[in-house]
């Protein structure tokens, strides 16, 4: 979403993580997604760093002015830890309900923030919203009925708004997994 807001064009490759292409491993030995290889050859391997890099180049909506690093770190650390164990308990030999309860604590923090404003750092969306929203989306999708039944009306409305946004719909292009020899795909599509 930050790439779209910043007007940063790139070639996009969909990767099936169970069959990581050698090109991904060569660019980023960590071989996780997303990865961006900048025009100068430098590699950025973290979503938030890709967002910051693109917005530092061009930030027409002032997203970087609405950044709460502590909230993003809480999301990327403790919340993601609990999300992974709630969503994939078989991978972690964990109790999904215990991790759902722990993850819900951050949801309450987000709900409280949204009581006073439309987005997490003000009335307009910013980098904090874009960084956290995909994780809230994943958390909600594990058990949509449970999530929708929680007393989180502002968070639920915030999530619905981001899911319905043209920005999100444009960002979530569905692609076939990339294979060596495939023609480059421009993002955003021309």
Where are these regions (language model features)?
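GST superfamily/GST-like fold recognition
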Residues: 120-145, 162
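Acidic/histidine-enriched, glycine/proline-rich intrinsically disordered or flexible terminal extensions
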Residues: 175-190
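C-terminal end-helix/capping segment
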Residues: 151-168
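Surface-exposed helix-capping loop/turn segments at secondary-structure junctions
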Residues: 112-123, 167-171
